[in-house]
Structures are given as C-alpha cells and as structure tokens.
Design a protein with these regions (language model features):
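Short, Lys/Arg-enriched N-terminal segments with co-localized hydrophobic residues
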Residues: 1-5
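Gly/Pro-rich turn-and-neighbor structural signature
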Residues: 7-85, 194-230, 234-244
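Internal mixed beta-strand/loop scaffold within catalytic domains of large alpha/beta enzymes
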Residues: 53-127
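Glycine-rich, often proline-containing surface loops adjacent to acidic residues and nearby aromatics
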Residues: 66, 92-95, 124-133, 179-200, ...
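Compact, glycine/acidic-enriched structural inserts
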Residues: 120-165
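Long, charged, mostly alpha-helical binding arms that flank functional sites
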Residues: 152-205, 220-222
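An amphipathic alpha-helical core segment
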Residues: 165, 169-187, 222-267
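TerminUS-proximal long segments
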Residues: 265-307
Length: 307
C-alpha cells in the first residue's frame, strides 16, 4: 500500500502551505523585478475568515500584480450550494490566487490559482489552474510553458496533462469573441479522493503546480523585459487587456464565487489590468504579428509540438 495514502491531511496543513507559497512567490517576483515591493493588506471577512492581499504596482517590470492568500469560512449561500451540488451549508475555503500585468506588451500576463474547499457534509476537494496570456504569442515560450506543466502533471498521472489542458482550453475561452484568453495551460476542479487517489496525493499535485509558477514566470520576465516595443504594441496590449477584463467579469468562476459570498471586492478584482481599451470593431492588418497572434487564440492547439 502506498504510504502517501496513510498520511493525514487537514485544513491547517493546507492553509499553512498556501501561506508559505504566497511568501515564496512574492520574494521571487520582487527579486526578479528589482524595484517593486509588495504592499500587504490584511482583511477580515464579516462572515468568517479573511486574507492577505499583496499588490505590486508601478514596479520595474510589473505594472500591476497581485498575490492573494485567503482563508474563508461560514455559511454557503443557497444559490452556491445548488451550483456546487452539495448538501452541507458550512464551508471552508483557502487558496492562493495570482495575476501579473507587466508594463511591456512582450512580457506575458500570467494567472495561477490553487485552492482547497470543504463542506460540512463531508465533501473535500482541490481546484486550480495556471494559464499564460501573451499579448504577442511566442510559440517557443508557449511550448516551454506547456512542457513544464506537462512534466509536472506526468509526475503524478499521465492522464492529467491532456485532461486538464483540454479543461483549460474550454474554461479560459471567451465565448462571445470565439477566442481563447491566451495560450491556455491547465485547469482542474473538484479533485477529491477516489478509490485510487488519496486527498493527500491530490495535494501533492497541487503543491507541484504551485511551485512551478515562480521559476517559469521569472524566466519569462528576464527573457522579455528588455525587448523594445512601440505605440502599436502598446495599443494592441490595451485591446488584449480588454479581453482579459471581459473574461474575468463574464465567465470567471472565482470572481462570481467571491462576489456571491461577500468576499473582499478589491481583492477579487485585483486581477483587472491597470488600463485597457475597447477600440470599436478592431481588426488587425492581414499578415501582421497581431493577426498571427489572433490566429493562435483557439482551442486544441498542440503547444508541445508547435514550435
């Protein structure tokens, strides 16, 4: 029998790990940026729990970024209990949520979320995901991003990458634009214990996903920060950031859950870019690098084999 199955896991162990993950990621981003310092705001949720919101603004590479930790508990609203199809109404949720918006249109936007959820009726599960939103798709970097994720997934289960990559393609999709938010990544939810996989093993997977964020993103920051760009690239960045806003306000489950459970609005909306633009009926010039990027924003791209 696998000894990992025998290990006990409770909400305090999970919460503690998430707190340290927030610390480590903030340190890595600050070190690579070279100028920015995260400002911390501690907050309490009236219904129970609270969190640590950490924001970096007007730094060297990062224009606006957030690394949020939260641990909330209380009574689950009826509407959400029905959506989650759970019987219990007392819930506990903890996790880390990250979004980085760089100044340069050549440094990609990145998002990661790792979370744990339990309900008084006994259900327990992990969820999360990591996805990359380049303003201009660099196939080699998209390939590297997916290779790192696939390697991490394969350490745990050879079906994870393909399953969770498809889930990300479907989830990070802006239906009214018929385009993906970026080059995707992985997305997963309701990862609980099964006959073959313990909750502890699920946690080990989530930890490994959390741990790849800093090495991957600091690499992209370093590689792309000094590439020159002009007004045209900044205009396209503002349009692509607008798409990011559309996804977050219309489709993002975390945004909906946070607002529906009286979460902290400023923390929930920290994923918003500092500036965005909605140029009416924007169409890129045929053959332009903007057109090339838009051609990549579709589901089922084999990013491992793309470059």
């Amino acid at each position: 029998i696998n000894t990992a199955i025998m290990k006990t896991l409770d909400r305090f162990v999970i919460t503690d790990w998430f707190i340290h993950l927030q610390d480590r990621i903030c340190q890595a981003i600050e070190k690579t940026d070279g100028k920015g310092v995260f400002e911390e705001e501690l907050w309490q949720r009236p219904g129970g729990g609270g969190g640590r919101t950490r924001i970096i603004q007007n730094a060297n590479i990062i224009e606006k970024g957030g690394v949020n930790f939260s641990q909330v508990h209380g009574v689950l609203p009826e509407k959400i209990a029905q959506q989650l199809q759970v019987k219990g109404h007392d819930f506990f949720a903890t996790g880390v949520s990250i979004v980085m918006h760089p100044f340069s249109p050549l440094v990609p936007i990145i998002h990661m979320n790792v979370r744990y959820f339990e309900v008084s009726s006994g259900e327990q599960w992990f969820g999360g995901g990591i996805d990359l939103t380049p303003i201009y798709v660099d196939p080699a970097q998209a390939q590297y991003f997916h290779q790192q994720i696939k390697h991490t997934c394969d350490l745990h289960d050879h079906t994870y990458y393909e399953t969770f990559k498809k889930w990300a393609d479907d989830y990070f999709f802006i239906k009214h634009r018929n385009e993906t938010r970026g080059v995707g990544g992985v997305f997963f939810d309701r990862l609980g214990a099964t006959a073959d996989i313990s909750l502890y093993q699920r946690f080990e997977f989530v930890k490994d996903i959390g741990n790849i964020f800093a090495p991957i993103y600091t690499k992209f920051m370093e590689e792309n920060k000094d590439i020159s760009y002009g007004k045209g690239e900044k205009q396209f960045q503002a349009i692509r950031r607008g798409r990011y806003v559309e996804f977050n306000l219309v489709y993002d489950k975390g945004t909906k859950f946070g607002l529906d459970t009286d979460g902290r609005t400023e923390s929930i909306l920290m994923s918003m870019p500092p500036e965005a633009n909605w140029l009416y009926n924007y169409q890129p010039f045929p053959g332009s690098k903007e057109a090339a990027t838009l051609a990549y924003l579709r589901k089922d791209v084999d990013w491992i084999g793309v470059a």
